[in-house]
Amino acid sequence: MTKKRRNGGRNKHNRGHVKPVRCTNCARCVPKDKAIKKFVIRNIVEAAAVRDITEASIWDSYVLPKLYAKLHYCVSCAIHSKVVRNRSREARRIRTPPLRSFPKDMARNNQNRK
């Protein structure tokens, strides 16, 4: 039978069994090595309320805490929520992650700091 991927869609080489994790979206059990992982760093406070909180704060240079979360997706949820996309046979061999695009406001702020 033909094989679509050299790794069979997983990262389990020479391991018999890998513990499952639950998909963040649908709670399906997925082997940890097969799950699509995404590490998200967000502000605890939403962007609209940041200015209000900084103005009301007693301390001048108080840095708002961030929320760190590692999301695990099953393959179907990752495709549906566009975390990953299907690629051509040649493009599947490219292992480098795609370039990260940032919002224009962040790019402008970075230029002002330099």
UniProtKB/Swiss-Prot annotation:
GO terms for molecular function: mRNA binding; structural constituent of ribosome. This is Small ribosomal subunit protein eS26. GO terms for cellular component: cytoplasmic side of rough endoplasmic reticulum membrane; cytosolic ribosome; cytosolic small ribosomal subunit; ribosome. Pfam families: Ribosomal_S26e (PF01283). GO terms for biological process: cytoplasmic translation. Belongs to the eukaryotic ribosomal protein eS26 family. The keyword Endoplasmic reticulum applies. Keywords: Cytoplasm, Endoplasmic reticulum, Ribonucleoprotein, Ribosomal protein. It is found in: Cytoplasm, Cytosol; Cytoplasm; Rough endoplasmic reticulum. Residues 87-114 are annotated as: Disordered. The keyword Metal-binding does not apply. PANTHER family: 40S RIBOSOMAL PROTEIN S26. Component of the 40S small ribosomal subunit. Its main location: cytoplasm. The lineage of its organism: Eukaryota, Metazoa, Ecdysozoa, Arthropoda, Hexapoda.
